[in-house]
A protein has these predicted regions:
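Transmembrane helical cores of multi-pass secondary ion antiporters/exchangers
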Residues: 2, 12-465
């Protein structure tokens, strides 16, 4: 019995000895395959960066050509009215078409990482918009701007969301659940009046109108992002009611703004009480850290980093900026603007790249009804709120001057209201949010619905630019 067991043990040992090289070879092959995959991934990422940087360089140089042509002879003056974003998108479409024709391998280089957008691209855009505000005009019209940005965004979201849901239910548009429709309403409510503001600047329009449109767009982006992310949580927590979402939206916005203000005031205090002005490099580096800190801190606290960095930028431009040395002031202003410009250009370029390279699902009923609902939601936003603001202003002037309210002109004229109605263009924020939704692992939303939302948002942005 012992010999048989011993022979069996030797046989098993022999088999293991023969199997050991096989397992070792399999491990080496697997490791080699893993290293090859890693090398291929690194190569793809490198070519992706080369493509992005080259396209950014071409877009920036074309922007320079536009600015140069706009300053020369009357024959080229029309170039001043051509938005830079439109040119960037067109260049992106051209590059995407070349990639598509070149083959599947090259077209796969075009990738979108939502984390890259929310962590690297969006924060500098939002911060710079707050940091570069003309504070006197902004705070002088703050009440009206808040009404249009907060209440107006909510109204637009509700009108577009419920409209898309109802039209889909009766078969006119693409069928969406109420939550899907409201998410679409929230992301499509993010405005981008870059083209309108460029024309405003060229025509030298009224400063109040300019600030209303610009101020609304600054706050609207942050409000739309917070509202979008609040609604996205419903896919994971379906038991919550929409009233709870509204309360969460208000609380998140409020506390996020508080975080941004606290960090900004702390930065102003540090810069004032120290002698960092003797070391401009250290001073500038610390300013950049304080600029980014509200976003990270708010996200760590499960708040809105976008809202925090917006209010941080506004307060830092009012206090921290004037505690910097003169070289650091110039450096910070120019660098913040440069980073925001690069981020905006990258987003618009990717919008153009996406048109020929992404897989699209067109639903003409949803696209056409979406455009109508956007204009309708914008109308329900602008005209009733402008009438309420004008009425309030008349009452205030009447109490102050003791004059008849009919003797006072409306604060926002009907002509200006129509301009504001059509200035709410869909922008890069809307497109980036819908791509984030597509990349999100949501089992409650079908891939077809995600594709329809991406295609519709892209077409609406292209058409209404």
């Amino acid at each position: 019995m012992r010999n048989r067991n011993g022979r069996g043990g030797c046989d098993r040992a022999g088999k293991l000895l023969w199997a050991a090289p096989v397992f070792a070879w399999a491990g080496v092959a697997k490791a080699a395959k893993g290293s090859e995959d890693l090398a291929l991934e690194e190569k793809t990422q490198s070519w992706n960066l080369v493509l992005v940087i080259t396209l950014l360089g071409v877009c920036i140089f074309c922007t320079y050509l536009l600015l140069t042509l706009g300053q020369q002879g009357s024959r080229a003056r029309w170039v001043r009215y051509l938005p830079e974003s439109v040119v960037t998108i067109m260049l992106g479409v051209l590059a995407g078409s070349v990639l598509t024709v070149s083959g599947q391998t090259l077209s796969n280089l075009v990738t979108f990482d939502p984390q890259t957008f929310f962590i690297l691209m969006l924060p500098p855009i939002i911060f710079e918009s707050g940091y570069s505000l003309q504070k006197g005009d902004f705070f002088g019209n703050l009440g009206s701007i808040l009404v249009f940005a907060v209440l107006g965004t909510l109204i637009s979201t509700i009108v577009v969301g419920f409209g898309a849901f109802i039209l889909g239910s009766v078969g006119i548009s693409y069928p969406l659940t109420l939550l899907d429709a409201l998410v679409f309403g929230a992301l499509i409510s993010a405005t981008d009046p870059v083209a309108t503001l460029a024309i405003f600047h060229a025509l030298d329009v009224d400063q109040t109108l300019y600030m209303l449109v610009f101020g609304e767009s600054v706050l609207n982006d942050a409000v739309a992002v917070v509202l979008f992310r609040t609604l996205m949580t419903f896919y994971e927590r379906e038991h919550e009611s929409y009233s709870e979402a509204l309360v969460q939206f208000v609380l998140v916005s409020l506390f996020s703004g508080v975080v941004g203000v606290i960090v900004a005031l702390f930065s102003a205090l540090v810069l004032k009480l120290t002698r960092l002005y003797q070391h401009p490099s250290l001073e500038t580096a610390l300013m950049f850290i304080f600029a980014y800190l509200p976003y990270l801190l708010a996200e760590a606290l499960n708040l809105s980093g976008i809202m925090a960095i917006l209010f941080g930028g506004i307060v830092m431009s009012h206090y921290s900026h004037f505690n910097l040395s003169t070289p650091s002031q110039l450096t910070c202003q120019q660098t913040f603007r440069t980073i925001a410009l690069i981020a905006e250009t990258a987003i618009f370029a990717y919008m153009g790249l996406s048109l020929p390279t992404l897989h699209h699902t067109f639903h003409m009923g949803f696209i056409c009804s979406g455009m109508v609902l956007i204009l309708l939601g914008r109308a329900f936003n602008i005209f009733p709120l402008a009438a309420a603001i004008n009425r309030r202003e008349r009452q205030r002037h009447q109490q102050a001057a003791r004059t008849s309210p009919t003797a006072l002109p409306a604060r926002i004229s009907l002509k200006e209201q129509f301009i504001m109605w059509f200035s709410g263009l869909r922008g890069a924020i809307a497109f980036s949010l819908v791509l984030n939704m597509q990349a999100h692992s949501l089992t409650a939303v079908s891939p077809e619905t995600k594709s329809v939302l991406v295609t519709t948002t892209l077409v609406i942005r292209m058409w209404m630019c």
